[in-house]
C-alpha cells in the first residue's frame, strides 16, 4: 500500500513532530469501521467512566485497553493499525528533537483512548503528568462540518488545527486542551464531529 506521509519537526515552543497523511487508505477504512461502531447510542462513555478529568471535559471516550485485553487486542482494528505509531522510523524522528524525547525510541508500554467531540464539547487545558509521551491522531468525516476542536496550548500561545488523518507527538508534560466544537444541525450519532485516537506511551522498564 502506497504511503504519502509528510513530517514536520519542531523544537519550539516545545518538542513535537507533526505527521500528515499518517494512515493509508486501507488503514483509514479499518479505523473508520471501528469509529462508526463506537458512535452508536450507549457506547462512548462520560469522563467519570473512562478516567477523564471530570471537571475539565464533557467529551466522551473509550479506553480500548480496558475492552480488548491480552489475546483479544487483535479484535480491534484500531489497536492493530495504530502499531504504526511505534514504528522505529516514527519514534527515531521524535527521539532526536530534544534530550527529553530521547528515550521515546525505547518505549515498551502504551495504552490507547478513542475520543469523540460533538457540538459544545471541549477539554480545558491540562497536563497528563503520569504519561511520558503522547501521540494524538485526528479524524473527521469529509466535508468537515464543524468549527473549533483545535488542540490548544495557551501557555505557549500555540495551537494545532488537527487536520484529518494527522498525528502530533509530544512529551506528556506539555499542557494542552481542546477548544469547544461547534456543529449546526447535526445529530450526535451521525458522527460528523471530531475524533481523536490518543496513544499514551513510555518506558516501564529500565
PLM regions: where:
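Short catalytic/ligand-binding loop motif for oxyanion handling, primarily in non-cytosolic enzymes
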Residues: 26-29, 52, 121-124, 145, ...
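A structural signal for short, well-ordered beta-strand segments
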Residues: 112-114, 135-137, 197-201
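Short beta-strand segments enriched in hydrophobic/aromatic residues
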Residues: 23, 35, 139, 201-203
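Conserved short histidine dyad/triad with adjacent acidic residue
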Residues: 114-128
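Catalytic core of Fe(II)/2-oxoglutarate
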Residues: 131, 141-142, 146-206
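A short glycine-rich, His/Asp/Glu-containing loop-to-beta-strand
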Residues: 103-116
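Non-heme Fe(II)/2-oxoglutarate
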Residues: 2-100
